[in-house]
């Protein structure tokens, strides 16, 4: 039986145990991460936490609605059985939520309520020489360029403040102040919980390229990155990801590129030999057709 529970009614220990043991587990569905990125979240729960579905919600003009949080690519239903029907959960969303627009996860498949198919790339990290054989000619060329410029990995001394400050200087046209603040909180909390790492490349005048990855359940999630002009000229981004892939401690992990639906970004991810995966967006609206969010 699927039941709806408000946030205060959720057993968070059972929830996190369910997520950790789910066949489609990811860090976005853990309680600490949901608490960071969601102003409010309730849940649908099958029996005694056999499967769970977070419901991130908010209010606008007095109307309760469900929407995908920022920095949280995939949610949906997390479960142990391969035979689960995601639409059983979607149809159990209380009618008090008059508008729903959220992403499922890859293993949820397509729903009757799907309105969009999204692109993602994942790479199983194995022997480094084997991985490199899957790189595109363009990526190998970028790595040779990085070698010619004698790029080096920076000492791991970046803090959340340093990372956010550097990115803000380079991405003002692409992110809002609210997004910068939330990203900073995620980086800071993840570092404190040992659930994230910052990797950087040293340039002529300090850090020229940096990435932040979330770490959990044998998966790495490429949550954020930035590159300056020097980085782009020297192939630092390719050099940095190749370095991460080479680390022995990550062998057997899955590296999640976090997209992308943008062709240019998708081509870069594909060039590392990553596997194309899909996930769906579901949407429905019980509001007046003239009411828009």
Please place each PLM-identified region on the residue numbering.
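Non-catalytic accessory segments adjacent to catalytic cores
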Residues: 84-120
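N-terminal charged segments
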Residues: 1, 7-64, 174-186, 190
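Aromatic (often tryptophan-rich) hydrophobic motifs at membrane interfaces
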Residues: 87-89, 195-293
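Acyltransferase donor/substrate-recognition loop-hinge adjacent to the catalytic core
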Residues: 1-6, 10, 110-177
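Short catalytic-loop micro-motif centered on adjacent basic/acidic residues
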Residues: 101, 154, 254-257
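Conserved donor-binding loop and adjoining core beta-sheet/short helix segment
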Residues: 17, 31-88, 203-230
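Short, conserved active-site entrance elements at the starts or edges of catalytic domains
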Residues: 24, 156-208
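Short, polar loop motifs at secondary-structure junctions
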Residues: 103-109, 139-141, 261-262
